[in-house]
């Protein structure tokens, strides 16, 4: 651990004092009093014209990596409004599959995107600040 984010900036330590602290590693929300690290993350996908870094939170202390298959991440379900962005093999955004919804209502949107033969992967972001919550890939 370097104490720096993917852009070379110092990580910010934040104590959880309310909603809005989703850990990008375990995909759970931070609990009140826990310390979270905030920094920029260079998304591996999409590359090209849709590439962008994203602010993310991580627990300061070790947490288990979320690795469940066929499950929606807790930080998605708990989020009031998410943006679902589907991409093809050329890493171009499939606008017709994109949607904004409450996290608890994302299952049919994901199912539709995953069923589409053009989709290679889907990124789910917080709709307001735009932070990456998780990436979904076809197996």
Predicted regions and their residues:
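N-terminal, charged amphipathic alpha-helical interaction modules
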Residues: 1-75, 82
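Short Gly/Ser/Thr- and Asp/Glu-enriched loop/turn motifs at secondary-structure junctions
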Residues: 126-131
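C-terminal edge-of-domain segments
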Residues: 132-139
